[in-house]
Regions:
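Noncatalytic, basic helical substrate-engagement surface that gates or grips nucleic-acid strands
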Residues: 1-133, 144-159, 235, 242, ...
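A general marker of short, structured functional hotspots
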Residues: 32, 36, 57-61, 76, ...
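Intrinsically disordered, low-complexity N-terminal regions enriched in serine/proline/glycine
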Residues: 35, 39, 64, 150, ...
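Short Gly/charged-rich anion-binding patches and loops
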Residues: 89, 138, 261
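Long, highly charged, low-complexity intrinsically disordered interaction regions
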Residues: 106-109, 113, 117-197, 211-217, ...
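Accessory alpha-helical DNA-binding modules that contact the DNA backbone or grooves
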Residues: 173-247, 259-284
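Acidic, Ser/Thr-rich, low-complexity intrinsically disordered regions in fungal proteins
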Residues: 254-257
Length: 284
């Protein structure tokens, strides 16, 4: 299974190349999909397009989640309303015309889709190799499963970490500034309000890691509360069961379009360069 982080793949190119033309963005997205499908289909099988749905459950749990992104987009010189319109349009075109399952669900991010599908391969009788196509280091935690690998399109190399479990624990303690999640020594509003976070020492994290089974006893009440906050937001095993079930059910029940749709679609959208290599869109 190839799990492609749709928004991350698309936005990384759009931001770098300052794209806002519908045809150029469509071509860029389709060409990326073609390239990764060709590269990994024979070893990893079917590709799954994993997309961000609206109204993520993390925002309900933690209102500050990714709050800075909206502010940063407002200050950007790119037309984000138009960019998201195109991303949504192309995602639906892929669902209707390309031979891939597209998982796009209300309340779920691509992280949830990738996490749930990767974890599902640990169930009896469902083991298969998994390749995650994303530069997001949040997925390092999934490397604890021997069948899961990750390729970074931005760095153009495999993402590797010697100890995924330790990485995940440190990530929880340190928080994630890009997602508006403070470290566990700092209050909920630290990043959104520009409040300086309380410094986090390596020694403190190591002490907590050595006593991970007794955190409630060795942390202050506030530290433990913030640890639980960050664990819920960062640890993919914390995805609510209802969302995990929705993702798995959608994946298992969704039908994919016939191969013949691909060529007709590329002709209709005048993707002339891609027409020449249409077979590279087919599953392995």
């Amino acid at each position: 299974m190839i799990l492609l982080d749709y928004s991350q793949i698309a936005l990384s190119n759009i931001i770098v190349q300052k794209l806002n033309d519908e045809n150029m963005i469509r071509h860029m997205i389709l060409n990326s999909i073609r390239m990764y499908n060709k590269k990994y289909r024979h070893e990893y099988g079917q590709m799954v397009i994993c997309a961000d749905g609206a109204n993520t459950w993390r925002k309900d749990y933690f209102p500050q989640y990714k709050g800075m992104r909206k502010k940063n987009r407002k200050e950007s010189d790119q037309d984000w309303t138009e960019i998201f319109r195109i991303l949504n349009l192309v995602r639906e075109e892929i669902r209707e015309n390309l031979p891939y399952k597209v998982i796009h669900l209300e309340g779920c991010e691509a992280d949830d889709v990738i996490g749930a599908l990767a974890m599902e391969t640990q169930e009896f009788g469902k083991h298969e190799p998994v390749m995650i196509i994303s530069s997001d280091k949040d997925f390092i935690q999934l490397h604890k499963y021997n069948n899961v690998k990750q390729y970074s399109p931005i760095q153009k190399k495999m993402v590797v970490d010697k100890n995924p479990r330790t990485y995940c624990f440190e990530h929880i303690c340190k928080g994630d500034k890009g997602d508006g999640i403070p470290n566990i020594l700092s209050p909920d509003n630290a990043i959104m309000e520009g409040i300086r976070q309380t410094p986090m020492t390596k020694k403190k994290i190591e002490y907590w890691a050595e006593n991970a089974d007794n955190l409630k006893d060795i942390m202050t009440q506030e530290e433990y509360r913030n640890y639980q906050r960050n664990k819920t937001l960062i640890d993919l095993s914390e995805i609510p069961e209802s969302h995990q079930a929705n993702i798995i059910n959608t994946f298992e029940e969704q039908k994919v379009p016939m191969k013949m749709n691909v060529l007709n679609y590329l002709i209709k959208k005048r993707c002339n360069l891609l027409i020449e290599c249409v077979e590279e869109f087919y599953n392995g």
